[in-house]
Every structure is written in C-alpha cells, then in structure tokens.
Design a protein with these regions (language model features):
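Short, acidic/small-residue loops that bind anionic groups at enzyme active sites
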Residues: 56-61, 105-132
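Glycine-rich oxoanion-binding loops at beta->alpha junctions
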Residues: 40, 49-80, 228
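Short glycine-rich or small-residue beta-strand-to-loop segments that form or flank ligand, phosphate
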Residues: 30-37, 53-56, 82-91, 98-101, ...
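C-terminal non-catalytic interaction/assembly regions of soluble proteins
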Residues: 226, 232-265
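Short, small-residue-biased leader/transition segments that mark boundaries at the very start
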Residues: 2-3
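Short Gly/Thr/Asp-enriched flexible loops that form oxyanion-binding sites at enzyme active sites
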Residues: 94-108, 128, 255-261
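Internal, active-site/partner-interface "lid" segment
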Residues: 123-132, 142-205
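Gly-rich Lys/Arg/Thr-decorated short loops/hinges at beta-loop-alpha junctions or inter-strand turns
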Residues: 27-35, 44-57, 122-125, 196-212, ...
C-alpha cells in the first residue's frame, strides 16, 4: 500500500481542498490551523504535527487559500475545546480565514478564534498587507501556541499565549535576487549583481532600500540593529532571545549557517 510508504503516515492530504492535516484529530484539545499561499515550504504544511498545527491550508503559489478551503479545514479539525486560526497579515489571508471562521461559527456552531501575525518591521504597509507583514515569526507562534494547546489549555489562554508571542517577535528580510513566480515567468524586480534588496517581502515585493552587497557580518549587524531598534519590541540588557534565520525557501543551508554565525556574534 502506497500510504504505508509515506514519509509522514501520521498525516493526510485532503486533495480536493488542498489541506494537510493530522490523520487523528484530538477532540479534547484546542486545534490550530494556519496556511497561506504555496511556494514558501516548509510553511505551512511542514509544521503540521504533535505540539504544532493540526492542519495547514495550501493556496496556489503566492495566492491565499480560498474561504471554502479554510472552512473545510476548520470542519475537519473541529474540537470540543475550539479552534485557533493563526493568520499571517496579508489581505487575502485575513479576509478568507476570517470569513471561513465566521461561517463555521454560524453554520456549524464551532468555537473559532484567530490571531494575526505581523512580525516584519521592514514596512508598515505593502501591496499584499494592511500594516506589517507576517513572515518567519509565524513559526514561533505555531510552536509556542501549539505547546499550550498540547498541555490542554483552553481557547482563550491559547490565544493569549499566541498573542504574547506576536507582541514579542520582530523580523527583517533581504534578498540578493528576485524570485520568479511560475505564473509570471520573469523576476518581479531587477537587482544588479553588486546590490541587495533590504526589507524584501516573501512574495518578492521590493524592499525599503537597495544597498551595495556587504559581507555576512556587516549584513547581520544591519539586520540585528533594525530588528532591535523598532516600535514593536524593546530589548534591554539581560533579555533572553530566540533567533531564527529563515531562508525564504531559496537560500542554501550552508549560507543560512554562515549568516546564523554572524547573527550570533
């Protein structure tokens, strides 16, 4: 049987609605759902598992999943303790997840609540968002809210913990080349070999500044300063910090480790 040879036999793929979910749903804990456009793997299907998400809803490449996809995911993972939607702050995601949650409440009497992740401090607005963008910081919300749900905490408490994570996470991105969406077939923006784009978005949105290429150590200094010096979080001496260096899906692991070393300096 082909399903016995799967890499993750504990998961199932609902092909009709492009939902990756746990095969067995624990109805006695808060269930967590996230999702978004495809093309950002392992987000979000790679984060479905014990102590993290119960389901991930996969849209087309760089496109939000539809309201019906999210609604079907909510129904498939409905729990006696309720469901928390973890939504990245992009206009399409917010609209479709919100509408799906409202429908599940109205039509199916499912207890649904939501949080909105907006960790990117590069911009206060973009083509895709209302306010700051949700990017790599979403993983911390999956992990910490997932642990709270696994411990049996109720929906208001899981939401409170998730929001506390959101209030204490900030991120910044950069790129040395533009991505090329399959539907477009050409790079979203042009970037000379000697330049890098600071504050680029996960869909290839141009950043806040084009700067000359610098070493990993110099880049880390710029990024850490920008993350530390913002209106989102205020760091002080002695604070403990969890760091994630994210490759946006296109950076070799060796280069991520190089930058991670620079960040930790």
């Amino acid at each position: 049987d082909v399903y016995k040879r799967q890499a993750h036999p504990e998961l199932e793929f609902v092909e009709k609605f492009k939902v990756v979910k746990k095969k067995e749903i624990n109805r006695d804990k808060v269930t967590l759902i996230s999702g978004g456009g495809s093309g950002h793997e392992p987000a979000h299907a790679g984060f479905v598992g014990k102590g993290m998400l119960d389901a991930a809803v996969c849209g087309d490449v760089f496109a939000s999943p539809s309201q019906i996809q999210v609604y079907e995911a909510i129904k498939a993972t409905a729990s006696d303790k309720g469901t928390l939607l973890i939504i990245k702050n992009y206009s399409g995601d917010c609209m479709n997840f919100n509408n799906a949650g409202a429908r599940a409440k109205e039509d199916d009497d499912i207890n649904v609540d939501a949080v909105f992740v907006n960790d990117d401090v590069a911009v206060t607005d973009s083509l895709y968002t209302v306010g700051r963008r949700g990017v790599a910081g979403t993983m911390f919300v999956h992990k910490i809210a997932g642990a709270a749900a696994e411990q049996g905490k109720d929906l208001p408490e899981v939401k409170r913990i998730a929001q506390k994570v959101i209030d204490n996470v900030a991120s910044i991105g950069f790129a040395i080349s533009s991505c090329t969406p399959p539907a477009k077939g050409t790079p979203i923006f042009e970037l000379a070999d000697e330049n890098m784009e600071f504050g680029v978005g996960i869909h290839g949105e141009p950043g806040v500044a084009t700067e000359k290429f610098v070493t990993s150590d110099e880049l880390a200094e710029k990024m850490v300063a920008r993350v530390k010096d913002n209106a989102v979080i205020q760091l002080k001496a002695g604070d403990e910090i969890a760091v994630i260096v994210n490759g946006f899906g296109g950076t070799p692991l060796s280069e991520i480790y190089v930058l991670n070393t620079s960040v930790n300096k």
